[in-house]
């Protein structure tokens, strides 16, 4: 048998891992062929001329670095054939397994998300978010066990059949790695000039790692931005000026490079003072998880999806332009009750307002309300006289998972608990505030005990994919119909107990849900109608609220309604963001008529929903309507950042 030279192992690892990662990247991101919902595609000759050499050099550096580190670790034993086995097991075996784990996570979180967005989905905890993914990837543990058995089998074969080699036959060294890294510098700079090529390269681990190192080395002023960051630092030696910098009002400096020097106008509107009449009304707030605004009035196969909400809208007030500020439950819940985009812990909230006013407060939630600090931020648990949530009834959960981020109860359990404490008019002797949370429309849109309201087969969890879009949509609308049925049962109970006419009911959603529109499933990916428009229905026909309305406006609306005051004046826009206000991936405003203007802070691309125009901010013509809209967005973003500091 011929001797196995180490460079054969390097070549094998290079080809196998690159081909495997490329297949996964293409399947997830479609960076080569393009596809549904993908606008960043490497499809031009100039892009390929940058993409291919940059990818090959970065991947070669990654494989060679693994080889050299492992060789140093083996020391004198690096000439043994066992070293080749360990090298291939590390790069091909473990490397490919980690790639699968990464793309399993991205299948849930979407590539639009960074750590801040994952933390949002995990309720503020990266650890919880990780458990959220692992909950979906139990097979990875079995794969790891299989890999260990495969390694032991290969170990036995190598020890028996493969010869060792002389160290002199191993000419590769650290100087070769240094040469590859030096070559990567101009290639990374060239990629920055081709946004689609840069996007494609950033999906590959090797290039992302090399670029991260270059970004750190050239961040001279340590402001987090450099020559190699997605948002190139225009002032590399001035830590006060960089992308996402807080623009100081009126100092003559444009710190963030958008919209010129910020001029602060329009402070936060003070919350109305609660002035209760002699006989205060009760309040019932119902939050429907992942409930789209266009569910109201929709029919599927000739059947109405929301007959109960339709009736409530006819009798009361239906605000057709209501929007979440973000696409995540935890932050939305805080905004609904705290009356701010990012309420401060211990700050004003509906729970604290009504507790101080003498209300009896009950929380009946199909979700774990401590998740992500919702309860603590708005004083939910501390204010409640009655508190029942999914964590308290974990044994009755609707799905198998017991992790905090996945807990949910069937809505009928929520009704059962409500009935235990509210059986008749005597239980409403005091002014009462009830908060009910219904989880039915959350992914995977069904559970074993969910009733059927719409015809046709519903999708199993394993069948939720773009190829089954029609079935997935039907499953979602069935869950929305079940949510509506539950709302109808709550209204019926209020009427039966004689308190409906003295109760202000508010029904809304925490965010919307994409059903493969533009290639997305779920929420939190983009700022658009499907993922951020929510229903807002008030039982009081006199409370004529004009849109657009954001979740942070609800506290003021409710306090005015309970006080008998007129609703607040209409606002000019609702601010939205992905990430956090200070470090967003995307910011946007939605103006009357459902017109979105969004700014991607990585590419500096501004998108206009009504015209379909996409252009870099600096390419917008001065004095144009598009430039004015983009500047309104930039101004509102800066204003909201300063309001959050007040």
For each of these PLM feature ranges, what is it?
Residues 195-275:
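Extracellular calcium-associated, cysteine-rich motifs in secreted modular proteins
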Residues 268-275, 304, 450, 495-541, ...:
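Histidine-centered active-site microenvironments of extracellular/periplasmic hydrolases
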Residues 212, 265, 269-285, 290-458:
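Active-site-proximal alpha/beta segments of enzymes that process anionic O-linked groups
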Residues 274, 502-503, 546-591:
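Polar, surface-exposed loop/tail segments
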Residues 319, 329-337, 393, 521-568:
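Substrate-binding rim/cap in mid-to-C-terminal beta-strand-loop elements of soluble/periplasmic
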Residues 1-207, 218:
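Transmembrane and membrane-interface helices of multi-pass
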Residues 409-426, 458-503, 561, 635-646:
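A long, amphipathic alpha-helix that forms part
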Residues 570-646:
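Phosphate/adenylate-binding glycine loop and adjacent helical scaffold
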């Amino acid at each position: 048998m011929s001797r196995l030279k180490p460079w054969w192992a390097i070549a094998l690892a290079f080809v196998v891992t690159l081909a495997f990662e490329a297949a996964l990247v293409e399947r997830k991101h479609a960076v080569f062929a393009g596809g549904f919902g993908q606008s960043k595609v490497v499809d031009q000759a100039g892009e390929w001329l940058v993409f291919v050499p940059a990818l090959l050099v970065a991947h070669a550096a990654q494989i060679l670095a693994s080889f050299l580190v492992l060789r140093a670790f083996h020391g004198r034993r690096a000439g043994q054939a066992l070293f080749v086995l360990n090298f291939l097991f590390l790069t091909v075996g473990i490397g490919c397994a980690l790639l699968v784990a990464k793309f399993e996570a991205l299948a849930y979180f979407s590539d639009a998300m960074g750590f801040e967005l994952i933390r949002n989905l995990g309720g503020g905890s990266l650890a919880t978010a990780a458990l959220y993914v692992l909950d979906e990837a139990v097979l990875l543990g079995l794969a790891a066990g299989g890999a260990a058995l495969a390694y032991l089998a290969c170990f036995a074969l190598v020890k028996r059949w493969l010869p060792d080699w002389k160290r002199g036959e191993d000419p590769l060294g650290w100087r070769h790695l240094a040469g590859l890294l030096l070559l990567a510098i101009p290639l990374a700079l060239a990629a920055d000039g081709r946004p689609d090529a840069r996007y494609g390269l950033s999906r590959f681990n090797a290039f992302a790692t090399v670029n991260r190192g270059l970004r750190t080395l050239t961040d001279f002023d340590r402001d987090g931005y450099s020559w190699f960051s997605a948002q190139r630092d225009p002032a590399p030696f001035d830590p006060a000026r960089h992308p996402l910098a807080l623009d100081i009002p009126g100092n003559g400096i444009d710190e963030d490079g958008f919209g010129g020097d910020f001029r602060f106008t329009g402070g936060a509107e003070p919350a109305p003072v609660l002035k209760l009449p002699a006989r205060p009304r009760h309040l019932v707030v119902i939050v429907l998880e992942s409930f789209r605004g266009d569910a109201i009035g929709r029919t599927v196969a000739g059947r109405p999806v929301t007959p109960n909400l339709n009736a409530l809208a006819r009798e009361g007030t239906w605000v057709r332009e209501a929007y979440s500020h973000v696409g995540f439950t935890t932050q939305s819940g805080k905004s609904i009750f705290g009356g701010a985009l990012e309420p401060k812990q211990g700050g004003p909230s509906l729970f604290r307002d009504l507790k101080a006013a003498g209300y009896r407060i009950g929380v009946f939630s199909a979700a774990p309300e401590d998740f992500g600090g919702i309860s603590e931020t708005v004083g939910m648990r501390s204010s409640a006289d009655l508190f029942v949530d999914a964590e308290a009834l974990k044994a009755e959960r609707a799905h198998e998972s017991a992790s905090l981020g996945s807990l949910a109860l069937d809505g009928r359990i929520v009704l059962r608990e409500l009935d235990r404490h509210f059986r008749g008019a005597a239980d409403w002797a005091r002014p009462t505030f009830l908060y009910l949370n219904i989880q039915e429309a959350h992914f995977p849109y069904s559970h074993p005990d969910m009733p059927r309201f719409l015809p046709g087969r519903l999708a199993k969890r394993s069948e939720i994919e773009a190829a089954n879009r029609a079935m997935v949509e039907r499953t979602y609308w069935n869950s929305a119909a079940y949510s509506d049925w539950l709302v109808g049962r709550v209204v019926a109970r209020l009427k039966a107990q004689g308190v409906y006419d003295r109760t202000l009911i508010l029904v809304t959603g925490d965010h919307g849900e994409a059903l493969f529109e533009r290639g997305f499933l779920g929420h939190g990916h983009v700022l658009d109608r499907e993922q951020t428009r929510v229903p807002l229905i008030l039982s009081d026909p006199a409370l004529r609220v004009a849109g657009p309305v954001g979740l942070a406006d609800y506290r003021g609306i409710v306090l005015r309604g309970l006080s008998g005051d007129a609703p607040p004046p209409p606002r000019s826009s609702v601010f939205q963001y992905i990430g956090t206000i200070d470090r967003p991936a995307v910011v946007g405003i939605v103006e009357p008529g459902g017109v979105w203007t969004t700014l991607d802070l990585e590419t500096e691309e501004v998108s206009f929903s009504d015209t379909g125009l996409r252009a870099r901010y600096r390419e917008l013509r001065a004095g144009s309507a598009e430039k004015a809209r983009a500047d309104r967005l930039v101004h509102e973003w800066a204003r909201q950042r300063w309001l959050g500091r007040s």
